[in-house]
Amino acid sequence: MAPAGILNGKLVSAQIRDRLKNQVTRMQEQVPGFTPGLAILQVGDRDDSNLYINVKLKAAEEIGIKATHIKLPRTSTESEVLKYVISLNEDASVHGFIVQLPLDSENSINTEAVINAIAPEKDVDGLTSVSAGKLARGDLNDCFIPCTPKGCLELIKEAGVQIAGRHAVVVGRSKIVGAPMHDLLLWNNATVTTCHSKTANLDKEVNKGDILVVATGQPEMVKGEWIKPGAVVIDCGINYVPDDTKPNGRKVVGDVAYDEAKERASFITPVPGGVGPMTVAMLMQSTVESAQRFLQKFKPGKWTIQYNKLNLKTPVPSDIAISRSCKPKLIGNLAREIGLLTEEVELYGETKAKVLLSALDRLKHQPDGKYVVVTGITPTPLGEGKSTTTIGLVQALGAHLRQNVFACVRQPSQGPTFGIKGGAAGGGYSQVIPMEEFNLHLTGDIHAITAANNLVAAAIDARIFHELTQTDKALFNRLVPSVNGIRKFSDIQIRRLRRLGIEKTDPTTLTDDEINRFARLDIDPETITWQRVLDTNDRFLRKITIGQSPTEKGHTRTAQFDISVASEIMAVLALTSSLEDMRERLGRMVVASSKKGEPISCEDLGVSGALTVLMKDAIKPNLMQTLEGTPVFVHAGPFANIAHGNSSIIADRIALKLVGPEGFVVTEAGFGADIGMEKFFNIKCRYSGLQPHVVVLVATVRALKMHGGGPTVTAGLPLPKAYTEEDLDLVEKGFSNLRKQIENARMFGVPVVVAVNVFKTDTDAELDLVSRLSREHGAFDAVKCTHWAEGGQGALALAQAVQRASQAPSSFQLLYDLKLSIEDKIRIIAQRIYGADDIELLPEAQNKAEIYTKQGFGNLPICMAKTHLSLSHNPEQKGVPTGFVLPIRDIRASVGAGFLYPLVGTMSTMPGLPTRPCFYDIDLDPETEQVNGLF
């Protein structure tokens, strides 16, 4: 018989490594920035372990796998090792890891406990009980196989032997080689016999094997004469035996007597150079397979989401009754369904979570989805249902059209919740749930804004007080205190010195003039624009006197409280793009001017770093869900008059990455299109760089009747008869407002879909008239929507229209160039969006325009603070007013947020409580902890 063919593990493993290298390259081409990750956890410092690990690290580097070696000292305890295992389980950059055995610790460590703590999806060594169980059951495509048996199988296949139907004999039953080898051969359809130290007539059993795998750890235990002629022999042994002819006095042999066996076998593995190289190659292959599974599971845009089925009732129950009738999914499950990693999500109970900005960094190379903004016509005081339409639309796109879709909405203030309006989370069968969580504390973002805002306010008045009561030297010495005889500037103080043009870092070298310039902000109290805030409607805080305590030595001034969401910090949160950007914006916020007319910022006050600390969690978007189980980001809620009235850029950007290129992100702009949409485009999109694909313009028959000359609509009172009976003439006259808002949206080059929000008193003739006129005057489409009563099903036609519109040509453009003068930018908005003949800058506004231009703020975008109840400055003028000049009473600056806001009329920034606030109905069931009466 001819000598056996040699199964060269070095050659086969080299071929496998080349194949893996190509696979890694292709993965990185498909997902830029992605690299398969392998970690090796070692306890102790055994020489043999160090050798094996170095071989693995080198192989990983050659293939393109990022390998990390974590080496723990011999003093490590079991709990310390387990902490590292858990950490690696949660590290998304590690797709597989192994615990190098044996564990070389001076403490007792349960190896089984450590191995079984490895997440099965990362168990690339295939040693956990879960992996072993799946292999034993034949779930070969859903588990990792121990590397040595896996390599042995590759070598058997390399021999060209058909495994199915052959008799295979495995000598050895270890958990690492023998037992899994038996299972692997069995599920490749061999008839398998496992032999071990207690097997009788071992030689005769071995002689039955067409395929023989030996893993006993006994040098040359299996003799050549035992082997069936023509068998394939796989020798897994590595043994050292004495050999005087070798320089080190020993040689390596396997578990099979090689020289004898090769005369009877058809193929045989040498030792070394057979199974050994294959073990390392299989570890690399399993790591690449794990990375591929990770990409498949977390591929952007590939969601495995389950939707909730609504149980619709007629008549439609109350919002809170509907909210409680639907059990929300666990928020952690929803996060996984939409492709978020465990370490990217911070759970706040079972129904809300924060999403870390690291998700955006992970997905930064992925294409964005389609971007949709929901706006409305000039509304009645009752509102026309933009929020409800937003939620109904995403439920239709997701639960009914099976599109990946995210809603991004503003977080409501608690003020209205306990005041007159009540909560806000959509309505009917189109809601964000749980409503109680949505409308109360949520995750504390508004509380963080309140704390940060009031820290600035406290810093302003304290600084004025201390400057008025101390000499330059005393003030400087307290600002730069001596610690152990040494004075040292803080980082923020060094930045102030740089802005002052003082290039010094040693406090002792400043001249008297430099000390004066550094220490004194010299704030002019009459110019302070920063107010304290509270998230409660409190009319008696609209104007207050502060500093009346004797300890303030008579330094009083008139001030006020605003509602928390009116704080510039809320606008900063909504417009920021990163932690670094937020830090810079918070520092740029201007709170007053000096007596020389120079702007005083939070950076000058030295408080910007502390503000960033207070806001570090608030910057993370809040994840919730709709009634039908689609995801919602609830993040930021700036005013829509003195601010831009849109949810956060960060939430939109993360959502656009998560939905994938075929998915949709639907966000809402506050008030009518002339205010919220205009600011969405000219401020939010300008800063984010994002380009919307579709505008959804919400209209109602009742609002059109109002604009057509219908009676006054008053919140809290029944609708006049004209609004509950058919009147086509009134609707057609009022269409002028909708026509103008369609025109406003198209001015930005984006397709417009009109969503006619249906009320039970609307007639088909009225609804058809609105739809027909909308299409005739430039809308891409106009559809009737019944999502309040029917959930996503009622917005199905709207969702289909949005899908079609998103494919239509668009040429997004901004309304004005930032380099224009402040006055010209205001004029463009007034004339083109509102239809004004011109603007009039009143003296205070003219003065502010000159000051801001001089201070370098003239190139900021414009955020008009105007009534939302009319296109003009007069809330009583409905339809499309003409022939008016828009009066600009004042101009103020939100420098940190990044806009100037001209005041058209008087803006209330602190609501008051009515005679009978909502809180009369609110209570808690002490047994169930259920909130009652909130809606």
From Swiss-Prot:
It catalyses: (6R)-5,10-methylene-5,6,7,8-tetrahydrofolate + NADP(+) = (6R)-5,10-methenyltetrahydrofolate + NADPH; (6R)-5,10-methenyltetrahydrofolate + H2O = (6R)-10-formyltetrahydrofolate + H(+); (6S)-5,6,7,8-tetrahydrofolate + formate + ATP = (6R)-10-formyltetrahydrofolate + ADP + phosphate. It comes from the Eukaryota. SUPFAM superfamilies: Aminoacid dehydrogenase-like, N-terminal domain, NAD(P)-binding Rossmann-fold domains, P-loop containing nucleoside triphosphate hydrolases. Pfam families: FTHFS, THF_DHG_CYH, THF_DHG_CYH_C. The modification Phosphoserine is found at S318, S413, S490. One of its GO terms (molecular function) is methylenetetrahydrofolate dehydrogenase (NAD+) activity. The keyword Amino-acid biosynthesis applies. GO terms for cellular component: cytosol; mitochondrion. Pathway: One-carbon metabolism; tetrahydrofolate interconversion. It is found in: Cytoplasm. Its EC number is 1.5.1.5, 3.5.4.9, 6.3.4.3. Residues 310-935 are annotated as: Formyltetrahydrofolate synthetase domain. The keyword Secreted does not apply. GO terms for biological process: 10-formyltetrahydrofolate biosynthetic process; folic acid metabolic process; heart development; L-histidine biosynthetic process; methionine biosynthetic process; methionine metabolic process; neural tube closure; neutrophil homeostasis. Substrate binds at Y52, I53, N54, V55, K56, V99, Q100, L101, P272, G273, G274, V275, G276. InterPro entries: Aminoacid_DH-like_N_sf, Formate_THF_ligase, Formate_THF_ligase_CS, NAD(P)-bd_dom_sf, P-loop_NTPase, THF_DH/CycHdrlase, THF_DH/CycHdrlase_cat_dom, THF_DH/CycHdrlase_CS. The modification N-acetylmethionine is found at M1. PROSITE patterns: FTHFS_1, FTHFS_2, THF_DHG_CYH_1, THF_DHG_CYH_2. NADP(+) binds at G172, R173, S174, S197. Trifunctional enzyme that catalyzes the interconversion of three forms of one-carbon-substituted tetrahydrofolate: (6R)-5,10-methylene-5,6,7,8-tetrahydrofolate, 5,10-methenyltetrahydrofolate and (6S)-10-formyltetrahydrofolate. These derivatives of tetrahydrofolate are differentially required in nucleotide and amino acid biosynthesis, (6S)-10-formyltetrahydrofolate being required for purine biosynthesis while (6R)-5,10-methylene-5,6,7,8-tetrahydrofolate is used for serine and methionine biosynthesis for instance. The N-terminal methylenetetrahydrofolate dehydrogenase and methenyltetrahydrofolate cyclohydrolase (D/C) domain carries both the methylenetetrahydrofolate dehydrogenase and methenyltetrahydrofolate cyclohydrolase activities. In the N-terminal section; belongs to the tetrahydrofolate dehydrogenase/cyclohydrolase family. HAMAP family: FTHFS, THF_DHG_CYH. This is C-1-tetrahydrofolate synthase, cytoplasmic. The gene is Mthfd1.
